[in-house]
Amino acid sequence: MTNGNNNNLEFAELKIRGKMFKLPILKASIGKDVIDISRVSAEADCFTYDPGFMSTASCQSTITYIDGDKGILWHRGYDIKDLAEKSDFLEVAYLMIYGELPSSEQYHNFTTKIAHHALVNERLHYLFQTFCSSSHPMAIMLAAVGSLSAFYPDLLNFNETDYELTAIRMIAKIPTIAAMSYKYSIGQPFIYPDNSLDFTENFLHMMFATPCTKYKVNPIIKNALNKIFILHADHEQNASTSTVRIAGSSGANPFACISTGIASLWGPAHGGANEAVINMLKEIGSSENIPKYVAKAKDKNDPFRLMGFGHRVYKSYDPRAAVLKETCKEVLNELGQLENNPLLQIAIELEALALKDEYFIERKLYPNVDFYSGIIYKAMGIPSQMFTVLFAIARTVGWMAQWKEMHEDPEQKISRPRQLYTGYVHREYKCIVERK
């Protein structure tokens, strides 16, 4: 994709070994501009070095904009707080995939297609039976999503219709697979999708209903989960999204690409942080212990860390956390736990103390999206091993939007990072009898 703001280019100058290079500065529509270093390796015979890609833009994108200093998160130009309060998850999914909010007719057609594709092939049931009963639901879902490649093996030569249909299939099937992963892990029968229910209701029904017991979805719980899904739908070029893009850049089957995103998301530094927050709050145990644990967090020689604080991008309050804090109170109030939920009380007091502490203020450590989401999940009856699974349901929308955008980009190339080699120089091979 070509950035339309770069007709009148400015240049940065870089001096390497006495030679001056002019590097184009690509203008962002908002936010930080980018220096184009794509010709440096060919012309200067050296690479750039950026561990963790903290200063590197790997692509151009129109999907998500983040200003970490100001606490801004926009999807296609819409503020995340507006989307969370006024929209629903499938409307946001449509926005992500197509770039615009849908009309009533477009929304109806889109949701109908999602419902139509929610079923998975019956043969997939046999795959679940190969896992031991103690398997983590993320492990099961990772394998199940990857196995969809076998059911759609022709998805290697794409056109625009294929991109859209593939995105719809993946968004539709991921909650079914997630619920199946949970049901198998607890030894209960699978529950089929119900097309009379909306996306979020359907997932909760597949999670908690049984063949002999109907599950009535509480509207407060449904709305809360809808917000959580919206808040987790996309977050620019994070680890899992970049993984999906890198896998997709080779032309791999899209279901295989999404499985790589799930694998990356499973890491405790990425999608598993909300489970770590719950464990931390349990460890703190009571409000009286908060000062002691805050002191431990400040001690660089103490391994204890405050989970749910700080973010690689945000240097102010995570806008998603602000929405989730209020959502958490709404859910617990509905369930009669607002005044007596010990985890919430510890979380609120811990946040209040941290926001007044110079140690956290100087380091710009504010609550992030993981700080309250786990408390909400736990109140809903969702076990901790399913927290990252629910994250994956929501983030699949972002992954598919990013995957689609990448394939539609005429400048797209197969990803090939370089390295700074620090190993041995050439060594002579010796036969084993000559080695000491």
UniProtKB/Swiss-Prot annotation:
Pathway where this protein functions: Carbohydrate metabolism; tricarboxylic acid cycle; isocitrate from oxaloacetate: step 1/2
Reaction equations catalysed: oxaloacetate + acetyl-CoA + H2O = citrate + CoA + H(+)
GO MF assignments: citrate (Si)-synthase activity
Active site residues of this protein: H311, D370
BP GO annotations: tricarboxylic acid cycle
Keywords linked to the UniProt accession: Acyltransferase, Transferase, Tricarboxylic acid cycle
GO cellular component: cytoplasm
PROSITE patterns: CITRATE_SYNTHASE (PS00480)
Keyword Transferase: yes
InterPro entries per UniProt: Citrate_synth-like_lrg_a-sub (IPR016142), Citrate_synth-like_sm_a-sub (IPR016143), Citrate_synthase (IPR002020), Citrate_synthase_AS (IPR019810), Citrate_synthase_bac-typ (IPR024176), Citrate_synthase_sf (IPR036969), Citrate_synthase_typ-I (IPR010953)
EC number: 2.3.3.16
Pfam families registered for this protein in UniProt: Citrate_synt (PF00285)
Note: Citrate synthase is found in nearly all cells capable of oxidative metabolism.
Similarity field: Belongs to the citrate synthase family.
Annotated protein name in UniProt: Citrate synthase
